[in-house]
From Swiss-Prot:
Pathway(s) served: Lipid metabolism; fatty acid biosynthesis
Record's subcellular location: Cytoplasm
Name listed for the protein in its UniProt record: Acyl carrier protein
Organism: Christiangramia forsetii (strain DSM 17595 / CGMCC 1.15422 / KT0803)
GO terms, biological process: lipid A biosynthetic process
Length: 78
């Protein structure tokens, strides 16, 4: 697991209070991890802060799973 992936996973565990074993790439924030719309906004904000990136709203709407978040952040950090 990359450093980015492990940091994303840690943020999700902290913010959503889920077991880290549930936080797999295919897991949907809302359907699998129980996040509501406010939770997803807070996750995006936390990703921006942690990785010092900006995620435009139109892009944030496309980040629905753990794997999508990791991929987006990895691309943004290149």
């Amino acid at each position: 697991m990359s450093d980015i992936a492990s940091r994303v996973k840690a943020i999700i565990v902290d913010k959503l209070g889920v077991d880290e074993n549930e936080v797999v790439n295919e897991a949907s924030f809302t359907n699998d991890l129980g996040a509501d719309s406010l939770d997803t906004v807070e996750l995006i904000m936390e990703f921006e802060k942690e990785f010092d990136i900006q995620i435009p709203d139109d892009q944030a709407e496309n980040i629905a799973t753990v794997g999508q978040a990791v991929s987006y952040i990895e691309d943004a950090k290149k």
